[in-house]
Amino acid sequence: MSSVTGSGITSGFIDLATYDNLERAMYGGSDATTYFVKEHYPVGWFTKLPSLAAKMSGNPAFGQQFSVGVPRSGDYILNAWLVLKTPEVELLAANQLGDNGTIRWTKNPMHNIVESVTLSFNDISAQSFNTAYLDAWSEYTMPEAKRTGYYNMIGNTSDLINPAPATGQDGARVLPAKNLVLPLPFFFSRDSGLALPVVSLPYNEIRITVKLRAIHDLLILQHNTTGAISPIVASDLAGGLPDTVEANVYMTVALITGDERQAMSSTVRDMVVEQVQAAPVHMVNPRNATTFHTDMRFSHAVKALMFMVQNVTHPSVGSNYTCVTPVVGVGNTVLEPALAVDPVKSASLVYENTTRLPDMGVEYYSLVEPWYYATSIPVSTGHHLYSYALSLQDPHPSGSTNYGRLTNASLNVTLSAEATTAAAGGGGNNSGYTTAQKYALIVLAINHNIIRIMNGSMGFPIL
């Protein structure tokens, strides 16, 4: 291996001598430094620690909702997460499917246990999201290095979502009680510059409200040879249907110096935040028509649209955006049948009778858009994205369209031939469509909004 001698290094100055107008536009002037000098950004002293959200009201039980107050023990809230302990579930030998019965939690347990979450200031909703958003957001923003850990957090693990045979059968087991964790994707959780300044909001009661689904919409009782699913009842389980659960909301609070605390409490501040909007759910039947449109009566500056056609044949089978219902596979695993493909064939976007996006194949929305503008391409089938922003996950504006100024915006979705086949039903055992499959079109929008903090309270200056 050769090396550059001292005289050879001198020739490197030729490169520096080529500096001209192009370089003036690309690089800094005489007061700039190279990448080899670390620039230091002095910040105020602070520390952070976890805190339990207290002042709980309501009942943390399946099918109920509860709310907690944001702790005042800190000056800023950096993030929040829900910890919930699932109950132990044992399928009795005398269940309604008998020896062929199996029991499991639905896919993405914590996404489905939580029906909705709302952040409110004095009963004014600042941000709200539901199961569909949790499914979609995690698909587009989850780095691969964190995916396995995230699945462990939300319960997407074999001990909970793989079928467990009834007592007395081969492979019989109990679905264990388990502590699950759901990071709550609020606007203040992704960028420290958007931390929630509770120190500046002494006159606001800040609460997080969590609505939980009923237990019979979460546990799947399925026949292990036909794939038939039956709504679960109390007599199927040892001890009956679980009711109350252990649930707590935790937050990371930051503590700052007295000088910064005093300055922040008297400063008027505008924060650019994100919110989630949902169009009314539209039931679609490809046997009646293959193309459907839904009006998108959204408001504010929309940065991204996310849409899915959800298979809603069985209420207990959540997070299913394919044409058919999963069945019990070999070794008591979950098997996706051959027709477990995307129900969407193509989609177009129309503004006021003008085509904004032509009819694009599903691969554009599920592969191309996420490749360029999101952190991840979805690993699950059936998720579709159109991002006005150059970076979906960046909370800072990088592109949007003000839907409040559009009088007629609609999304036109064409369903696939496989969806038409499955909607007719009549498939064989374990085909996933022995019964007619039902679908719902779900459209979500992520929008920017302005929160103004002034005189100890928050508000929305632009409604």
UniProtKB/Swiss-Prot annotation:
Function per UniProt: Major capsid protein that self assembles to form a T=133 or T=147 icosahedral capsid.
The protein's name: Major capsid protein
Quaternary structure note: Homomultimer.
One Gene Ontology molecular-function label: structural molecule activity
Protein's UniProt keywords contain Metal-binding: no
Subcellular location: Virion
Keywords: Capsid protein, Late protein, Virion
Record family assignment: Belongs to the NCLDV major capsid protein family.
Originating organism: Frog virus 3 (isolate Goorha) (FV-3)
Any one Pfam family match given in the protein's UniProt record, by short name: Capsid_N
Domain of life: Viruses
Coiled coil regions, renumbered to chain: none
GO CC annotation: viral capsid
